[in-house]
C-alpha cells in the first residue's frame, strides 16, 4: 500500500467515530473517552461549598452528639481539678511531633482546633465497611468536610479541658443535640466562649474565611461537618472547637487506617 493510501485509510478510520452508551469510541484512540455529565469529585465538593453558605431550618440536625455527663459513650479523665474529655483530630505528618508529648500542654492557634469525638466516629463506623486504606482515608476527608486535595493521613486522639470547648454553630452550647439556623437571643455581641473568646466575632471571622482559598471547607454552621460525598445526606460528624491555649493531653497518634480499623472491629 502506498503512503497516500495509508493516509487515506487512517483518515477514514478517524472519521468512523461512534457514540455508544455515552462513551466516545474512535479508531484513532486506544482509550475510550467518557462524555458523562455526572458530577466529578471536585464538583461535589464545590456544590457543598456553595450550599454550606446558606444555612436554613431545613438543614438543622437533631442528632448532634452532646458533650455531657449523661453521654455514656464519651471517655473522660481528670488532671488536677480539670475535667477533660477525649476528642480527636485528623492531622498531617508535620503536626505529629506537636502531639508526641507525654505530659499536658497548651495548644496555640488563634482560631482554635476543630475536633470531633471518637464516640461519634464509632457510631458511623459503617461508612468504612468494605473500603481499603486509600478509600477509607478519602471517606474520612469527605465526612469531615475537608478539601479534596487534603493530605491528612494521621489521627491524634487527646483529652482536652472541657470548659474550653464550644460548638461552631449558631448555638455554641456543647451539651445539646441541635443548633438553630440563627443566633439565639442570648448570644449577643458580648457573648464569650471557651475562656473568653468573643463568639460573634469568631463566627464572623469564620464566615469570612472558611469558604475562601485553596483549603476552603464547606462549614455548615449548624454543629456538624458537611459530608460532601455524592450519596451522603449532608450531615457528617458533630464538631467542636478547642480554643487557643486549651490544655490537652495526648492519648494516641496513629495512621488514619489504624484509627478506622479500631472503629470497625
Q: What is the meaning of each model-derived region?
A:
Residues 141-265:
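Conserved NAD+-utilizing ADP-ribose enzyme module
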Residues 2-15:
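Bacterial N-terminal signal peptides that target proteins for export
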Residues 25-27:
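C-terminal motif of bacterial Sec signal peptides marking the signal peptidase cleavage site
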Residues 13-23:
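Bacterial N-terminal signal peptides
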Residues 118-137:
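Short active-site loop/helix that positions an aromatic residue
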Residues 91, 114-121, 159-164:
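Short, flexible loop/turn elements at secondary-structure junctions
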Residues 101, 134-144:
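N-terminal post-signal-peptidase region of extra-cytosolic proteins
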Residues 31-115:
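ADP-ribose/NAD+-binding catalytic cleft of ART/PARP-like enzymes
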Amino acid at each position: 500500500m502506498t503512503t497516500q493510501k495509508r493516509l487515506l485509510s487512517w483518515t477514514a478510520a478517524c472519521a468512523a467515530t461512534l457514540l455508544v452508551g455515552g462513551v466516545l469510541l474512535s479508531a484513532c484512540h486506544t482509550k475510550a473517552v467518557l462524555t458523562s455529565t455526572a458530577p466529578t469529585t471536585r464538583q461535589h465538593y464545590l456544590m457543598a461549598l456553595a450550599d454550606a453558605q446558606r444555612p436554613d431550618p431545613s438543614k438543622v440536625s437533631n442528632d448532634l452528639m452532646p458533650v455531657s455527663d449523661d453521654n455514656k459513650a464519651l471517655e473522660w479523665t481528670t488532671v488536677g481539678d480539670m475535667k477533660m474529655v477525649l476528642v480527636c483530630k485528623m492531622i498531617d505528618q508535620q503536626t505529629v511531633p506537636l502531639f508526641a508529648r507525654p505530659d499536658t500542654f497548651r495548644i496555640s492557634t488563634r482560631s482554635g482546633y476543630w475536633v470531633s469525638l471518637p464516640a461519634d466516629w464509632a457510631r458511623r463506623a459503617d461508612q468504612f465497611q468494605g473500603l481499603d486504606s486509600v478509600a477509607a482515608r478519602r471517606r474520612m476527608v469527605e465526612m469531615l468536610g475537608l478539601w479534596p486535595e487534603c493530605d491528612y493521613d494521621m489521627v491524634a486522639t487527646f483529652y482536652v479541658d472541657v470548659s474550653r470547648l464550644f460548638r461552631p454553630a449558631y448555638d455554641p452550647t456543647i451539651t445539646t443535640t441541635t443548633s438553630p439556623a440563627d443566633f439565639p437571643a442570648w448570644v449577643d455581641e458580648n457573648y464569650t466562649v471557651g475562656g473568653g473568646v468573643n463568639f460573634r466575632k469568631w463566627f464572623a471571622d469564620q464566615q469570612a474565611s472558611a469558604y475562601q482559598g485553596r483549603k476552603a471547607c464547606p462549614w455548615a454552621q449548624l454543629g456538624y461537618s458537611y459530608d460532601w460525598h455524592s450519596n451522603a445526606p449532608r450531615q457528617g460528624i458533630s464538631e467542636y472547637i478547642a480554643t487557643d491555649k486549651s490544655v490537652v493531653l495526648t492519648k494516641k497518634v496513629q495512621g488514619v487506617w489504624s484509627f478506622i480499623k479500631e472503629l470497625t472491629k
